Protein backbone atom coordinates (compact mmCIF):
# COMPACT_ATOMS: atom_id res chain seq x y z
CA UNK A 1 0.00 0.00 0.00
CA UNK A 2 1.24 3.50 -0.85
CA UNK A 3 1.92 5.76 2.07
CA UNK A 4 2.96 9.25 2.87
CA UNK A 5 3.52 10.95 -0.47
CA UNK A 6 1.87 14.35 -1.10
CA UNK A 7 -0.07 14.65 -4.33
CA UNK A 8 1.10 16.88 -7.17
CA UNK A 9 -0.92 20.02 -7.86
CA UNK A 10 -3.38 19.39 -10.71
CA UNK A 11 -1.67 21.90 -13.02
CA UNK A 12 1.72 20.35 -12.27
CA UNK A 13 0.32 16.89 -13.01
CA UNK A 14 -1.19 17.97 -16.34
CA UNK A 15 2.01 19.71 -17.41
CA UNK A 16 4.16 16.77 -16.36
CA UNK A 17 1.95 14.30 -18.25
CA UNK A 18 2.14 16.44 -21.40
CA UNK A 19 5.92 16.54 -21.04
CA UNK A 20 6.09 12.77 -20.53
CA UNK A 21 4.06 12.23 -23.70
CA UNK A 22 6.38 14.56 -25.63
CA UNK A 23 9.42 12.48 -24.66
CA UNK A 24 8.16 9.67 -26.91
CA UNK A 25 9.28 11.80 -29.85
CA UNK A 26 12.89 11.34 -28.72
CA UNK A 27 12.66 7.63 -29.39
CA UNK A 28 15.33 5.40 -27.91
CA UNK A 29 18.72 6.68 -26.73
CA UNK A 30 21.22 4.15 -25.46
CA UNK A 31 23.78 5.40 -22.95
CA UNK A 32 24.10 6.02 -19.23
CA UNK A 33 25.17 9.66 -19.04
CA UNK A 34 21.76 11.32 -18.96
CA UNK A 35 20.29 8.84 -16.49
CA UNK A 36 23.31 9.05 -14.19
CA UNK A 37 23.20 12.86 -14.23
CA UNK A 38 19.45 12.83 -13.61
CA UNK A 39 19.76 10.49 -10.62
CA UNK A 40 22.38 12.80 -9.12
CA UNK A 41 20.28 15.90 -9.83
CA UNK A 42 17.21 14.40 -8.13
CA UNK A 43 19.19 14.27 -4.90
CA UNK A 44 17.54 11.08 -3.73
CA UNK A 45 18.63 9.66 -0.36
CA UNK A 46 20.99 6.70 -0.29
CA UNK A 47 18.94 3.53 -0.86
CA UNK A 48 17.91 1.55 2.18
CA UNK A 49 16.70 -1.26 -0.07
CA UNK A 50 18.46 -3.99 -2.06
CA UNK A 51 18.33 -3.72 -5.84
CA UNK A 52 18.04 -6.65 -8.25
CA UNK A 53 18.79 -6.01 -11.94
CA UNK A 54 17.41 -8.48 -14.51
CA UNK A 55 18.36 -8.78 -18.19
CA UNK A 56 17.80 -11.37 -20.92
CA UNK A 57 16.28 -11.85 -24.36
CA UNK A 58 13.08 -13.42 -23.07
CA UNK A 59 11.60 -14.10 -19.65
CA UNK A 60 13.20 -11.22 -17.78
CA UNK A 61 9.87 -9.61 -16.90
CA UNK A 62 8.51 -12.96 -15.78
CA UNK A 63 11.55 -13.41 -13.55
CA UNK A 64 10.90 -10.00 -11.98
CA UNK A 65 7.27 -11.04 -11.48
CA UNK A 66 8.20 -14.40 -9.92
CA UNK A 67 10.77 -12.88 -7.59
CA UNK A 68 8.37 -10.12 -6.56
CA UNK A 69 5.58 -12.59 -5.88
CA UNK A 70 7.91 -14.72 -3.76
CA UNK A 71 9.00 -11.68 -1.76
CA UNK A 72 5.38 -10.70 -1.21
CA UNK A 73 4.66 -14.21 0.10
CA UNK A 74 7.18 -13.80 2.93
CA UNK A 75 6.15 -10.24 3.78
CA UNK A 76 9.00 -8.36 2.07
CA UNK A 77 7.82 -5.17 0.39
CA UNK A 78 9.06 -4.77 -3.16
CA UNK A 79 8.81 -2.22 -5.91
CA UNK A 80 9.29 -3.29 -9.53
CA UNK A 81 10.07 -1.41 -12.72
CA UNK A 82 9.13 -3.25 -15.92
CA UNK A 83 8.34 -2.36 -19.52
CA UNK A 84 6.47 -2.00 -21.72
CA UNK A 85 3.14 -1.23 -20.11
CA UNK A 86 0.07 -2.85 -21.61
CA UNK A 87 -2.65 -0.30 -20.92
CA UNK A 88 -1.37 2.60 -18.82
CA UNK A 89 2.01 3.87 -17.79
CA UNK A 90 1.47 3.28 -14.06
CA UNK A 91 1.99 -0.46 -14.71
CA UNK A 92 5.70 0.20 -15.12
CA UNK A 93 5.93 0.96 -11.41
CA UNK A 94 4.31 -1.66 -9.20
CA UNK A 95 4.33 -1.72 -5.42
CA UNK A 96 3.90 -5.26 -4.11
CA UNK A 97 2.65 -6.30 -7.53
CA UNK A 98 0.00 -3.60 -7.92
CA UNK A 99 0.38 -0.59 -10.25
CA UNK A 100 0.89 2.62 -8.29
CA UNK A 101 -2.06 5.01 -8.36
CA UNK A 102 -2.27 7.78 -10.93
CA UNK A 103 -1.98 10.42 -8.21
CA UNK A 104 1.10 8.78 -6.77
CA UNK A 105 2.72 8.38 -10.19
CA UNK A 106 1.97 12.02 -11.03
CA UNK A 107 3.57 13.27 -7.81
CA UNK A 108 6.81 11.43 -8.62
CA UNK A 109 6.62 12.50 -12.27
CA UNK A 110 6.31 16.14 -11.21
CA UNK A 111 9.61 15.81 -9.33
CA UNK A 112 11.32 14.37 -12.41
CA UNK A 113 9.80 17.04 -14.65
CA UNK A 114 11.01 19.81 -12.35
CA UNK A 115 14.51 18.32 -12.30
CA UNK A 116 14.62 18.10 -16.10
CA UNK A 117 13.45 21.71 -16.43
CA UNK A 118 16.06 22.85 -13.93
CA UNK A 119 18.98 20.97 -15.49
CA UNK A 120 17.98 21.09 -19.16
CA UNK A 121 18.45 17.32 -19.47
CA UNK A 122 16.79 15.77 -22.51
CA UNK A 123 15.33 12.45 -21.41
CA UNK A 124 13.54 9.63 -23.21
CA UNK A 125 10.19 8.15 -22.17
CA UNK A 126 11.95 5.07 -20.80
CA UNK A 127 14.44 7.14 -18.81
CA UNK A 128 11.68 9.29 -17.32
CA UNK A 129 9.62 6.32 -16.19
CA UNK A 130 12.71 4.69 -14.66
CA UNK A 131 13.39 7.90 -12.73
CA UNK A 132 9.77 7.95 -11.56
CA UNK A 133 10.29 4.44 -10.18
CA UNK A 134 13.40 5.60 -8.31
CA UNK A 135 11.54 8.56 -6.81
CA UNK A 136 8.75 6.23 -5.67
CA UNK A 137 11.31 3.80 -4.23
CA UNK A 138 12.98 6.62 -2.27
CA UNK A 139 9.61 7.62 -0.86
CA UNK A 140 8.22 4.15 -0.13
CA UNK A 141 11.45 2.49 1.03
CA UNK A 142 10.65 -1.07 -0.03
CA UNK A 143 12.83 -3.95 1.08
CA UNK A 144 13.77 -4.75 -2.53
CA UNK A 145 13.76 -2.83 -5.82
CA UNK A 146 13.44 -5.02 -8.94
CA UNK A 147 14.63 -3.53 -12.25
CA UNK A 148 14.01 -5.02 -15.69
CA UNK A 149 16.30 -3.81 -18.47
CA UNK A 150 14.67 -2.26 -21.49
CA UNK A 151 17.16 -3.31 -24.19
CA UNK A 152 20.49 -5.07 -23.82
CA UNK A 153 22.21 -4.10 -20.60
CA UNK A 154 25.53 -2.33 -21.05
CA UNK A 155 23.98 0.90 -22.34
CA UNK A 156 20.47 0.52 -20.93
CA UNK A 157 19.38 3.31 -18.59
CA UNK A 158 18.80 0.80 -15.78
CA UNK A 159 22.56 0.12 -15.74
CA UNK A 160 23.11 3.57 -14.21
CA UNK A 161 21.32 2.43 -11.04
CA UNK A 162 23.53 0.79 -8.37
CA UNK A 163 22.52 -2.85 -7.84
CA UNK A 164 23.28 -5.61 -5.36
CA UNK A 165 22.46 -8.61 -7.51
CA UNK A 166 22.15 -9.34 -11.25
CA UNK A 167 20.17 -12.01 -13.10
CA UNK A 168 20.37 -12.96 -16.78
CA UNK A 169 17.63 -15.15 -18.25
CA UNK A 170 17.60 -16.94 -21.63
CA UNK A 171 19.52 -15.46 -24.56
CA UNK A 172 18.63 -15.43 -28.23
CA UNK A 173 19.32 -13.45 -31.40
CA UNK A 174 17.21 -10.29 -31.07
CA UNK A 175 17.69 -6.60 -31.85
CA UNK A 176 20.77 -7.68 -33.82
CA UNK A 177 21.04 -4.25 -35.46
CA UNK A 178 21.76 -2.79 -32.01
CA UNK A 179 23.15 -5.61 -29.87
CA UNK A 180 25.17 -7.48 -32.49
CA UNK A 181 24.62 -10.32 -34.91
CA UNK A 182 25.90 -13.21 -32.79
CA UNK A 183 24.89 -14.76 -29.49
CA UNK A 184 28.41 -13.99 -28.25
CA UNK A 185 27.94 -10.26 -28.90
CA UNK A 186 24.45 -10.20 -27.38
CA UNK A 187 25.67 -12.06 -24.29
CA UNK A 188 28.41 -9.46 -23.82
CA UNK A 189 25.88 -6.62 -23.92
CA UNK A 190 23.55 -8.25 -21.41
CA UNK A 191 26.24 -9.57 -19.06
CA UNK A 192 27.58 -6.02 -18.68
CA UNK A 193 24.99 -5.60 -15.91
CA UNK A 194 27.44 -7.51 -13.68
CA UNK A 195 28.35 -5.42 -10.63
CA UNK A 196 31.79 -5.54 -8.96
CA UNK A 197 31.98 -8.12 -6.16
CA UNK A 198 28.21 -8.73 -6.37
CA UNK A 199 26.51 -12.02 -7.32
CA UNK A 200 25.25 -12.56 -10.87
CA UNK A 201 23.01 -15.54 -11.66
CA UNK A 202 22.97 -16.57 -15.32
CA UNK A 203 20.90 -19.21 -17.06
CA UNK A 204 23.43 -21.68 -18.41
CA UNK A 205 23.95 -21.39 -22.15
CA UNK A 206 25.39 -23.99 -24.52
CA UNK A 207 26.95 -21.53 -26.96
CA UNK A 208 30.64 -21.38 -26.07
CA UNK A 209 31.11 -17.87 -27.44
CA UNK A 210 28.26 -16.63 -25.26
CA UNK A 211 29.75 -18.38 -22.22
CA UNK A 212 33.11 -16.71 -22.83
CA UNK A 213 31.43 -13.31 -23.13
CA UNK A 214 29.56 -13.78 -19.86
CA UNK A 215 32.65 -15.03 -18.02
CA UNK A 216 34.67 -12.07 -19.32
CA UNK A 217 31.98 -9.60 -18.27
CA UNK A 218 31.89 -11.13 -14.79
CA UNK A 219 35.69 -11.06 -14.48
CA UNK A 220 35.84 -7.42 -15.60
CA UNK A 221 32.69 -6.13 -13.89
CA UNK A 222 32.39 -2.44 -13.19
CA UNK A 223 31.93 0.77 -15.17
CA UNK A 224 34.22 3.62 -14.06
CA UNK A 225 32.11 6.12 -16.01
CA UNK A 226 29.37 5.76 -13.39
CA UNK A 227 31.73 5.61 -10.43
CA UNK A 228 32.25 1.86 -10.14
CA UNK A 229 35.66 0.42 -9.25
CA UNK A 230 36.25 -2.62 -11.51
CA UNK A 231 36.40 -5.96 -9.72
CA UNK A 232 35.16 -9.45 -10.51
CA UNK A 233 31.51 -10.29 -9.97
CA UNK A 234 30.46 -13.58 -8.36
CA UNK A 235 29.22 -15.61 -11.33
CA UNK A 236 26.73 -18.43 -10.73
CA UNK A 237 25.50 -20.59 -13.64
CA UNK A 238 21.94 -21.87 -13.24
CA UNK A 239 21.14 -25.09 -15.10
CA UNK A 240 17.61 -25.21 -16.52
CA UNK A 241 16.14 -27.75 -18.93
CA UNK A 242 16.17 -26.41 -22.52
CA UNK A 243 12.45 -27.14 -22.89
CA UNK A 244 11.45 -25.14 -19.80
CA UNK A 245 8.70 -22.56 -20.26
CA UNK A 246 9.13 -18.98 -19.08
CA UNK A 247 7.44 -19.50 -15.73
CA UNK A 248 9.58 -22.52 -14.91
CA UNK A 249 12.68 -20.58 -15.94
CA UNK A 250 11.61 -17.56 -13.89
CA UNK A 251 10.91 -19.63 -10.81
CA UNK A 252 14.28 -21.40 -11.13
CA UNK A 253 16.19 -18.14 -11.57
CA UNK A 254 14.36 -16.49 -8.66
CA UNK A 255 14.97 -19.51 -6.43
CA UNK A 256 18.68 -19.56 -7.32
CA UNK A 257 19.09 -15.89 -6.38
CA UNK A 258 16.86 -16.13 -3.30
CA UNK A 259 19.56 -16.78 -0.71
CA UNK A 260 21.52 -13.70 -1.84
CA UNK A 261 18.75 -11.35 -0.72
CA UNK A 262 19.12 -10.14 2.86
CA UNK A 263 15.38 -10.09 3.54
CA UNK A 264 15.01 -13.65 2.23
CA UNK A 265 18.23 -15.40 3.20
CA UNK A 266 16.78 -17.22 6.23
CA UNK A 267 13.60 -18.34 4.48
CA UNK A 268 12.76 -21.09 2.03
CA UNK A 269 11.75 -20.01 -1.48
CA UNK A 270 7.91 -20.02 -1.46
CA UNK A 271 6.13 -22.60 -3.56
CA UNK A 272 3.50 -21.40 -6.03
CA UNK A 273 2.30 -23.07 -9.20
CA UNK A 274 1.95 -20.05 -11.44
CA UNK A 275 1.55 -16.32 -11.85
CA UNK A 276 -1.07 -13.88 -12.94
CA UNK A 277 1.37 -11.86 -15.05
CA UNK A 278 -0.65 -9.51 -17.30
CA UNK A 279 -0.35 -10.33 -20.98
CA UNK A 280 1.53 -13.56 -20.34
CA UNK A 281 -0.61 -16.71 -20.41
CA UNK A 282 -3.32 -14.36 -19.20
CA UNK A 283 -6.84 -15.81 -19.25
CA UNK A 284 -9.96 -13.66 -19.48
CA UNK A 285 -13.40 -15.30 -19.40
CA UNK A 286 -16.21 -13.21 -20.87
CA UNK A 287 -19.28 -12.80 -18.71
CA UNK A 288 -22.42 -13.98 -20.44
CA UNK A 289 -20.91 -15.86 -23.39
CA UNK A 290 -18.28 -17.71 -21.35
CA UNK A 291 -15.84 -17.27 -24.24
CA UNK A 292 -12.29 -17.83 -22.96
CA UNK A 293 -9.47 -15.57 -24.12
CA UNK A 294 -5.81 -16.48 -23.61
CA UNK A 295 -3.41 -13.58 -24.10
CA UNK A 296 0.27 -14.36 -24.63
CA UNK A 297 3.04 -11.92 -25.45
CA UNK A 298 5.55 -13.47 -27.85
CA UNK A 299 7.52 -10.67 -29.44
CA UNK A 300 10.44 -12.44 -31.15
CA UNK A 301 11.13 -15.85 -32.77
CA UNK A 302 12.55 -17.53 -29.67
CA UNK A 303 9.69 -16.16 -27.59
CA UNK A 304 7.14 -17.52 -30.06
CA UNK A 305 8.88 -20.91 -30.06
CA UNK A 306 8.76 -21.15 -26.27
CA UNK A 307 5.15 -19.96 -26.07
CA UNK A 308 3.88 -22.35 -28.74
CA UNK A 309 5.76 -25.26 -27.17
CA UNK A 310 4.03 -24.53 -23.87
CA UNK A 311 0.65 -24.22 -25.59
CA UNK A 312 0.71 -27.30 -27.80
CA UNK A 313 -0.68 -29.68 -25.16
CA UNK A 314 -3.34 -27.31 -23.80
CA UNK A 315 -6.76 -28.96 -23.56
CA UNK A 316 -8.56 -25.89 -24.90
CA UNK A 317 -7.55 -26.69 -28.49
CA UNK A 318 -10.04 -29.57 -28.43
CA UNK A 319 -12.72 -26.87 -28.57
CA UNK A 320 -13.54 -24.64 -31.56
CA UNK A 321 -10.97 -21.87 -31.25
CA UNK A 322 -9.84 -18.72 -32.99
CA UNK A 323 -6.37 -17.28 -33.45
CA UNK A 324 -5.94 -13.51 -33.16
CA UNK A 325 -2.46 -12.47 -34.26
CA UNK A 326 -0.62 -9.18 -34.64
CA UNK A 327 3.05 -8.28 -34.58
CA UNK A 328 5.47 -5.41 -34.58
CA UNK A 329 8.24 -5.52 -37.25
CA UNK A 330 10.55 -8.55 -37.16
CA UNK A 331 13.90 -8.98 -38.87
CA UNK A 332 13.08 -12.70 -39.17
CA UNK A 333 9.32 -12.84 -39.70
CA UNK A 334 9.49 -16.34 -41.23
CA UNK A 335 11.20 -17.66 -38.10
CA UNK A 336 8.66 -15.82 -35.96
CA UNK A 337 5.73 -17.46 -37.75
CA UNK A 338 7.05 -21.02 -37.98
CA UNK A 339 6.12 -22.14 -34.42
CA UNK A 340 2.68 -20.53 -34.77
CA UNK A 341 2.09 -22.25 -38.11
CA UNK A 342 3.06 -25.58 -36.55
CA UNK A 343 0.62 -25.01 -33.68
CA UNK A 344 -2.16 -24.28 -36.18
CA UNK A 345 -1.37 -27.42 -38.15
CA UNK A 346 -1.42 -29.55 -35.03
CA UNK A 347 -4.62 -27.96 -33.71
CA UNK A 348 -6.38 -26.23 -36.63
CA UNK A 349 -8.28 -23.10 -35.55
CA UNK A 350 -11.80 -22.47 -36.81
CA UNK A 351 -10.85 -18.88 -37.59
CA UNK A 352 -7.65 -16.87 -38.03
CA UNK A 353 -8.00 -13.13 -37.48
CA UNK A 354 -5.24 -10.60 -38.12
CA UNK A 355 -4.83 -7.13 -36.71
CA UNK A 356 -2.23 -4.39 -36.18
CA UNK A 357 -1.05 -3.56 -32.64
CA UNK A 358 -1.54 0.07 -31.65
CA UNK A 359 0.32 2.57 -29.42
CA UNK A 360 3.65 0.73 -29.38
CA UNK A 361 7.15 2.00 -30.02
CA UNK A 362 6.89 0.71 -33.59
CA UNK A 363 3.83 0.51 -35.87
CA UNK A 364 2.14 -2.85 -36.26
CA UNK A 365 2.94 -4.98 -39.29
CA UNK A 366 0.17 -4.42 -41.88
CA UNK A 367 -2.38 -7.22 -42.06
CA UNK A 368 -1.70 -7.60 -45.77
CA UNK A 369 1.92 -8.56 -45.05
CA UNK A 370 0.91 -11.04 -42.36
CA UNK A 371 -1.76 -12.55 -44.61
CA UNK A 372 0.77 -12.99 -47.40
CA UNK A 373 3.29 -14.65 -45.09
CA UNK A 374 0.71 -17.01 -43.57
CA UNK A 375 -0.80 -17.72 -46.97
CA UNK A 376 2.48 -19.28 -48.04
CA UNK A 377 1.74 -21.95 -45.44
CA UNK A 378 -1.80 -22.51 -46.80
CA UNK A 379 -3.44 -20.94 -43.76
CA UNK A 380 -6.72 -19.25 -44.61
CA UNK A 381 -7.40 -15.85 -43.07
CA UNK A 382 -10.97 -15.36 -41.84
CA UNK A 383 -10.83 -11.61 -41.23
CA UNK A 384 -8.37 -8.72 -40.98
CA UNK A 385 -8.76 -5.46 -39.08
CA UNK A 386 -6.39 -2.51 -38.79
CA UNK A 387 -7.64 -1.82 -35.26
CA UNK A 388 -7.60 -4.53 -32.54
CA UNK A 389 -10.89 -3.27 -31.08
CA UNK A 390 -12.65 -4.20 -34.33
CA UNK A 391 -10.95 -7.60 -34.34
CA UNK A 392 -12.12 -8.28 -30.78
CA UNK A 393 -15.68 -7.28 -31.69
CA UNK A 394 -15.64 -9.67 -34.67
CA UNK A 395 -14.39 -12.59 -32.56
CA UNK A 396 -16.89 -11.88 -29.78
CA UNK A 397 -19.71 -11.86 -32.32
CA UNK A 398 -18.77 -15.48 -33.11
CA UNK A 399 -18.89 -16.59 -29.46
CA UNK A 400 -21.63 -19.14 -30.16
CA UNK A 401 -19.21 -21.08 -32.38
CA UNK A 402 -15.82 -19.99 -31.00
CA UNK A 403 -15.47 -21.04 -27.38
CA UNK A 404 -11.76 -20.23 -27.06
CA UNK A 405 -9.48 -17.52 -28.42
CA UNK A 406 -5.69 -17.34 -28.49
CA UNK A 407 -4.38 -13.80 -28.81
CA UNK A 408 -0.63 -14.00 -29.41
CA UNK A 409 2.13 -11.75 -30.68
CA UNK A 410 3.02 -8.24 -29.63
CA UNK A 411 2.62 -7.26 -25.97
CA UNK A 412 1.09 -4.05 -27.26
CA UNK A 413 -1.62 -6.18 -28.88
CA UNK A 414 -2.29 -7.82 -25.51
CA UNK A 415 -2.81 -4.36 -24.05
CA UNK A 416 -5.12 -3.35 -26.89
CA UNK A 417 -7.21 -6.49 -26.37
CA UNK A 418 -7.40 -6.09 -22.60
CA UNK A 419 -8.81 -2.61 -23.13
CA UNK A 420 -11.29 -3.83 -25.73
CA UNK A 421 -12.44 -6.58 -23.36
CA UNK A 422 -12.75 -4.14 -20.46
CA UNK A 423 -10.31 -6.27 -18.46
CA UNK A 424 -7.96 -3.41 -17.64
CA UNK A 425 -8.59 -2.42 -14.02
CA UNK A 426 -5.84 -2.54 -11.39
CA UNK A 427 -6.80 -6.07 -10.39
CA UNK A 428 -6.35 -7.32 -13.95
CA UNK A 429 -3.04 -5.49 -14.28
CA UNK A 430 -1.55 -6.68 -10.99
CA UNK A 431 0.99 -9.48 -10.56
CA UNK A 432 -0.28 -12.22 -8.27
CA UNK A 433 1.13 -15.66 -7.44
CA UNK A 434 -1.20 -18.62 -7.99
CA UNK A 435 -1.30 -21.49 -5.48
Report residues per predicted region.
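Acidic, Mg2+-coordinating active-site environments of NTP-dependent enzymes
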Residues: 144-148, 163-267
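N-terminal leader/targeting and accessory segments in enzymes
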Residues: 1-58, 62-77, 86-87, 201-202
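ATP-dependent carboxylate-amine ligase catalytic core
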Residues: 12, 26, 32, 36-47, ...
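Short Gly/Thr/Asp-enriched flexible loops that form oxyanion-binding sites at enzyme active sites
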Residues: 67, 154-164, 418-419
Amino acid sequence: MEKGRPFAHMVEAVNARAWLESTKERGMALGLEHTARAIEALGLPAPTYETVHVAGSNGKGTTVAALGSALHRIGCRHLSFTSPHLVRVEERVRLDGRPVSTAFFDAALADVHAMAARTGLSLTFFEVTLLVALVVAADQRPDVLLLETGLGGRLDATRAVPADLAIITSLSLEHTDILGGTLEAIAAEKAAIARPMKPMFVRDVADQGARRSIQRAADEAGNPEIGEQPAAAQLHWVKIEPEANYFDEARAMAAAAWGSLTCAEKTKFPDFRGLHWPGRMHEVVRAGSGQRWLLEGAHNPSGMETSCRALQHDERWKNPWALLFGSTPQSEMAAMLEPLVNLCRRHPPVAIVLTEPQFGRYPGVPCTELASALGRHDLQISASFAHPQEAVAWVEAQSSTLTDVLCIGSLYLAGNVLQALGADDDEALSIVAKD
